[in-house]
Amino acid sequence: MENVLIIRYGEIMLKGDNKSFFEAKLTKHIRGAVKDLGDVKVYKMHSRVYIDVEDFNADEIIERVKKVFGVVCISPAVRFPVDFDVIKETALNQIKEEMAQRGVKTFKVESKRVDKKFPLKSPEMSREIGGYILENTEGLEVDVHNPEVRVYVEVRECSFVFTKKVYGFGGLPLGTNGKALLLLSGGIDSPVAGWLVAKRGVEIHGMHFHSYPFTSERAKEKVVDLAKILTTYCGRIKLYSVNLLAIQKEINEKCPEEEMTILSRRFMMKIAERVANKIGCDALVTGESIGQVASQTVKGLHVTNAAVELPVFRPLIAMDKVDIMDLARKIDTYETSILPFEDCCTVFLPKRPVTQPRLEKILRSEALLDVEGLIESAIGDMEVERISLDDE
Ligand SMILES: Nc1ncnc2c1ncn2[C@@H]1O[C@H](COP(=O)(O)OP(=O)(O)OP(=O)(O)O)[C@@H](O)[C@H]1O
């Protein structure tokens, strides 16, 4: 009898001829996530990935594998050659363990017969195993609708018995859908936006704008911390830091005060696009959401968008703030995002930012600036940091 983790994936199954490419990537990422935990054997077999584990105490492995995009759910299971008597006994033992640990009183057996040569059909298996459990326990009842514990039995090339399903985030394996550059502020939204795009298999890198020395070192470190949290899902991220201060000063001097935010945002987009093109990213990602702040009106988004040609992915565009916050908590970025450090956008915060900008007017203001020179100089001073899971 062996202890294994069964790792299931969802959407990859629909990939037709490309399925094996996606499976290979997923297996590689799962291996990468656990490689420093010792000699952990990870392998793919019959449209699932398995990990051999010493015992059921595989919490750390499960915690990490759960974060690998593409993983739908994980079950710690026992595997053994197909033998119905052993199946019944193992199911009984697992229920007894649940009774001892959690005091469960109701259960249901869910069986699956994949090997059609096995003589009992799935419902017959469930009935017999359920009957055997009832005969050999006291105070336990079957509840088919809302059981406290489900005992899963599978008859495939081997038998599997388990009681737990730990859910991952689904999505597609990282690196199966190209590369994008995330505009990563220290706020709540952009880390969530990057996470959502990465979940679709896109390798992401980050670009942060600061106004040092008006913004502090600690504010920059906060963004590095956020990028580190993202690497627990994405493995590694290159973080590009750009000082926007010279640009902001120039806008402040030459353009109408109320256009500061929208003009700065257009510079951010242009700089990000320039760097994205250099490093092979085919899209930008932002945490913008309609109506959330003054610059995120539909007109504001239009004017921001018009600064670049690359596609801009805004996965939060129609989400409410509370839902974004919930997701931030789920992916562990929230607590870091709410730390009170200043952002470059607050350095020259206009009293009444324009909320309904007209593109022609913004372009006229922009023409007062040496856009090209300012961009080149900001990129020239850019810093790059390679952040990876192994950094600690
Ligand atoms: N300093 C920055 N560095 C990098 N990107 C930024 C910066 N400030 C804003 N952005 C990008 O522009 C988007 C909109 O920023 P804005 O400040 O208008 O909204 P927000 O709701 O506060 O966003 P966030 O919560 O992500 O900071 C951000 O989600 C981010 O993608």
Swiss-Prot record:
<dbReference type="GO" id="GO:0000049">
    <property type="term" value="F:tRNA binding"/>
</dbReference>
<dbReference type="GO" id="GO:0009229">
    <property type="term" value="P:thiamine diphosphate biosynthetic process"/>
</dbReference>
<dbReference type="GO" id="GO:0005829">
    <property type="term" value="C:cytosol"/>
</dbReference>
<protein>
    <recommendedName>
        <fullName>Probable tRNA sulfurtransferase</fullName>
        <ecNumber>2.8.1.4</ecNumber>
    </recommendedName>
</protein>
<feature type="domain" description="THUMP">
    <location>
        <begin position="59"/>
        <end position="166"/>
    </location>
</feature>
<keyword id="KW-0547">Nucleotide-binding</keyword>
<comment type="function">
    <text>Catalyzes the ATP-dependent transfer of a sulfur to tRNA to produce 4-thiouridine in position 8 of tRNAs, which functions as a near-UV photosensor. Also catalyzes the transfer of sulfur to the sulfur carrier protein ThiS, forming ThiS-thiocarboxylate. This is a step in the synthesis of thiazole, in the thiamine biosynthesis pathway. The sulfur is donated as persulfide by IscS.</text>
</comment>
<comment type="pathway">
    <text>Cofactor biosynthesis; thiamine diphosphate biosynthesis.</text>
</comment>
<dbReference type="InterPro" id="IPR020536">
    <property type="entry name" value="ThiI_AANH"/>
</dbReference>
<dbReference type="GO" id="GO:0004810">
    <property type="term" value="F:CCA tRNA nucleotidyltransferase activity"/>
</dbReference>
<dbReference type="InterPro" id="IPR049962">
    <property type="entry name" value="THUMP_ThiI"/>
</dbReference>
<dbReference type="Pfam" id="PF02926">
    <property type="entry name" value="THUMP"/>
</dbReference>
<keyword id="KW-0820">tRNA-binding</keyword>
<comment type="similarity">
    <text>Belongs to the ThiI family.</text>
</comment>
<dbReference type="Pfam" id="PF02568">
    <property type="entry name" value="ThiI"/>
</dbReference>
<keyword id="KW-0694">RNA-binding</keyword>
<keyword id="KW-0963">Cytoplasm</keyword>
<keyword id="KW-0784">Thiamine biosynthesis</keyword>
<dbReference type="InterPro" id="IPR014729">
    <property type="entry name" value="Rossmann-like_a/b/a_fold"/>
</dbReference>
<dbReference type="InterPro" id="IPR054173">
    <property type="entry name" value="ThiI_fer"/>
</dbReference>
<dbReference type="GO" id="GO:0009228">
    <property type="term" value="P:thiamine biosynthetic process"/>
</dbReference>
<feature type="binding site">
    <location>
        <begin position="208"/>
        <end position="209"/>
    </location>
    <ligand>
        <name>ATP</name>
    </ligand>
</feature>
<dbReference type="GO" id="GO:0002937">
    <property type="term" value="P:tRNA 4-thiouridine biosynthesis"/>
</dbReference>
<dbReference type="GO" id="GO:0140741">
    <property type="term" value="F:tRNA-uracil-4 sulfurtransferase activity"/>
</dbReference>
<dbReference type="InterPro" id="IPR049961">
    <property type="entry name" value="ThiI_N"/>
</dbReference>
<dbReference type="GO" id="GO:0052837">
    <property type="term" value="P:thiazole biosynthetic process"/>
</dbReference>
<dbReference type="InterPro" id="IPR050102">
    <property type="entry name" value="tRNA_sulfurtransferase_ThiI"/>
</dbReference>
<dbReference type="InterPro" id="IPR004114">
    <property type="entry name" value="THUMP_dom"/>
</dbReference>
<keyword id="KW-0808">Transferase</keyword>
<dbReference type="InterPro" id="IPR003720">
    <property type="entry name" value="tRNA_STrfase"/>
</dbReference>
<keyword id="KW-0067">ATP-binding</keyword>
<feature type="binding site">
    <location>
        <position position="287"/>
    </location>
    <ligand>
        <name>ATP</name>
    </ligand>
</feature>
<dbReference type="Pfam" id="PF22025">
    <property type="entry name" value="ThiI_fer"/>
</dbReference>
<feature type="binding site">
    <location>
        <position position="265"/>
    </location>
    <ligand>
        <name>ATP</name>
    </ligand>
</feature>
<dbReference type="GO" id="GO:0005524">
    <property type="term" value="F:ATP binding"/>
</dbReference>
<feature type="binding site">
    <location>
        <position position="296"/>
    </location>
    <ligand>
        <name>ATP</name>
    </ligand>
</feature>
<feature type="binding site">
    <location>
        <begin position="183"/>
        <end position="184"/>
    </location>
    <ligand>
        <name>ATP</name>
    </ligand>
</feature>
